[in-house]
C-alpha cells in the first residue's frame, strides 16, 4: 500500500510542485482483474494516474501495464536458473497456469514510445506472448516438480478487465484504454 498508493500520491504531488512535463506509472497485469491486495493497490495507482491526466494540465500522464518481464529480478527464469545451478528440478506452481511475458528490451522501447504518445491518463498495454508455465519449463528442462498455487494466485492473469475490454482500442502492438472523465 505504501509504495503503490502513497508512493503514487507523493509522485503526483511532486510533479505538481515541479511542473513536470510527463508522468509514467508502471503497472502490472494483476491490476486488470484485481483481487489480492497487491493487484488492488496497483489498480488504485492506475486510477490516480488517470485522475492526474485530467486535473494536472501541465503534465502528460499515462500508465503502462505489463505482464512478466523477462530478465528482471524475481521472475520465474531467475528462480529456474538457480534451481538448474543446483541440479534441482524446476519448480512449477501449476502446469496449466498461463502468464504473459515480455522481454526487458521490449519494455524499455515501449516505455520510450509511450512517453511520446501519452496525454491524459491513458493505460497502454503492449501485446505480449501468453505461455503456460509447463510450456516454458519444458524449453529449459524436462525435470519439474509441481509445488501448487500460492494463496491468491490465478491460473491466468488478464491484461484487461471485462469493463476495459469494452472500451479498449486495439492498435497494432498495444491496447489503449482512455480514462473515464
Write out the residue ranges for each language-model feature.
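N-terminal Rossmann-like NAD(P)+-binding domain of SDR-like oxidoreductases, especially those catalyzing
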Residues: 1-63
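Strand-loop microenvironment adjacent to phosphate/nucleotide-handling motifs in alpha/beta enzyme folds
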Residues: 47, 51-181
Amino acid at each position: 500500500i505504501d509504495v503503490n498508493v502513497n508512493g503514487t500520491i507523493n509522485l503526483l504531488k511532486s510533479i505538481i510542485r515541479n511542473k513536470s512535463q510527463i508522468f509514467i506509472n508502471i503497472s502490472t497485469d494483476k491490476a486488470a482483474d484485481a483481487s489480492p491486495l497487491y493487484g488492488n493497490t496497483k489498480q488504485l495507482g492506475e486510477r490516480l494516474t488517470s485522475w492526474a491526466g485530467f486535473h494536472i494540465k501541465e503534465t502528460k500522464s499515462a500508465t503502462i501495464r505489463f505482464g512478466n518481464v523477462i530478465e528482471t529480478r524475481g521472475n520465474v527464469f531467475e528462480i529456474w536458473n538457480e534451481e538448474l545451478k543446483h541440479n534441482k528440478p524446476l519448480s512449477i506452481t501449476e502446469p496449466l497456469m498461463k502468464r504473459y511475458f515480455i522481454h526487458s528490451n521490449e519494455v524499455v522501447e515501449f516505455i520510450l514510445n509511450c512517453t511520446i504518445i501519452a496525454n491524459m491518463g491513458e493505460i497502454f498495454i503492449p501485446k505480449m506472448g501468453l505461455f503456460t508455465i509447463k510450456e516454458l519449463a519444458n524449453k529449459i528442462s524436462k525435470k519439474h516438480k509441481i509445488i501448487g498455487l500460492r494463496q491468491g494466485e490465478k491460473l491466468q492473469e488478464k491484461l484487461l478487465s471485462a469493463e476495459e475490454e469494452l472500451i479498449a482500442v486495439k492498435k497494432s502492438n498495444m491496447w489503449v484504454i482512455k480514462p473515464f472523465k
